[in-house]
Amino acid sequence: MSEHAETHNIIIAGVERDLRLFEVKPGVKIAILNILGDTELVQAAARDLAKALHDFRAEVLVTAEAKSIPLAHALSVAMGLPY
């Protein structure tokens, strides 16, 4: 792995991350965000999402894919909802 990998900077809910870019085909690069284990980012995102969703009358939270489970769990705690 290169010591100077190309990255894309993002800020989510005030938390800054530099996402490594991966070339998926010649000339096409994508940034990968993996929230598994990133508790600082998950908690901040859940806090801001809970505020944004405050006026919705949700009864339960559902997520479709394993990597989003930490965010769904943190959001359920912040909103007091089952998931």
Specify the residue positions occupied by each region the protein language model found.
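Glycine-rich, small/polar surface segments that engage phosphate groups of diverse ligands
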Residues: 60-83
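Active-site-facing substrate-recognition patch
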Residues: 1-57
